[in-house]
Amino acid sequence: MVVDKARVVALIALNKDKMSNKIVDIQELRREFKMGGEIVKALKGVSFAIEPGEFVTIMGSSGSGKTTLLNTLGCLDKPTSGTYLLDNVDVKKLSRNELAKLRNQKIGFVFQSYNLLARTSAMENVELPLLYNSAVSAGERHKRAVEALEAVKLKDRLDHLPNQLSGGQQQRVAIARALVNQPVMILADEATGNLDTRTSYEIMSLFQELNKEGKTIIFVTHEPDIATFSSRTIVLKDGHIIKDSKNENIRSAKEMLAGLPTKDE
């Protein structure tokens, strides 16, 4: 099935004069699944919005609805009812192929397990999202990939394969890949889950730097200390939001990193 580009453009342009500047606008979102003869209600009327430039952490234990919400935010799943506007586009109205196009254009994904192609260089891994964008030439693709790797301080690792990089460096490549398509938001799923404390702080310091540059970041984690590096925390339980609050005392990951003992100590 060919993506109807004209329809996607039309949906984005629809009612432009009424558009808000919210990156994410979710209202009364519900998601139900059939498991055997039972109906499982994973999300039970969730509502929240995220403004440009926010750094939001989403937390919740197993069964809270966190994974379902993550899949919805990433346009990997559609709600049973309610609305999800991503950069003013109503996700529920899009076909599967249109959702894939929207994902590629609007969202930069960062995963816990990096999801890098093993036999592909850092540069080539970062270029991958741009291969699906026919408007980007090979020269522009190369330029953007270099700039993204420079932004995560890996300019000297362009030709390295994943197995030639540390875990922290692999995650930096994944972050560069998330940045390369100039998305409206970065969606990170447990991005420090496989890293030690020092490397976790290095990655969170990078996310804080990107946020200071104006990047909108949604960071899913189960670690309360990681949430303190963001400006806002949303907590889910049993399909409901039980907490949505600004973080009054945001920790600096750079300062926390500087306070760690050196390897020789």
Stretches found by the model and what they are:
Residues H240-D264:
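Conserved beta-strand-loop-alpha-helix hinge in the C-terminal portion
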Residues V3, L94, V136, E248-R251:
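Short coil/turn linker and secondary-structure boundary residues
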Residues M1-K18:
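N-terminal amphipathic/basic-hydrophobic helices that include classical n-h-c signal peptides
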Residues K22-L236:
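ABC family nucleotide-binding domain
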